[in-house]
Amino acid sequence: MKIKSFLLIILFFIISKIHISFADEAKMTKGFEIFNETAACAACHVLKAAGSEGNIGPNLDTVAGLNYDSVMDIVTHGLGVMPAFGEDEILTKEEIDIVSFYVANSAGK
């Protein structure tokens, strides 16, 4: 009985991991679309994973300390000449979350 319970717990964790990776993959795909089309980040930024070659904003592949929280803050509130996509209601909170996840997991890759 203990072995059966143990195997069920292991199976549950394996299935949970698979579901999480599918969710992350879907989020990355949607993030790519937002980066390249909806928000047009690619027009200004270099990001190898997105195939973008913008030359106005910083190269996101070389920015030190780029993580989800920092990207989320910059996209929401803007920085320098970059618009505040959240404050100006250019993107929804969900879109900002998705594109921030995408950039944080793509930069430097």
Region annotations inferred by a language model:
Residues 25-48:
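Sequence/structural segment immediately N-terminal to covalent heme-attachment motifs in c-type
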Residues 36, 40, 65, 76-80, ...:
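Sec-exported extracytoplasmic/periplasmic mature domains
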Residues 42-76, 81:
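Gly/Gly-Pro-rich "capping" loops immediately C-terminal to redox-active cysteine motifs
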Residues 1-3, 75-81, 90:
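Extended, non-globular alpha-helical segments
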Residues 22, 37, 54:
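His/Cys-centered metal/cofactor-coordination and adjacent catalytic loops
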Residues 1-26, 108-109:
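N-terminal export/targeting leaders of redox proteins
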Residues 88-109:
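C-terminal capping alpha-helices of c-type cytochrome domains
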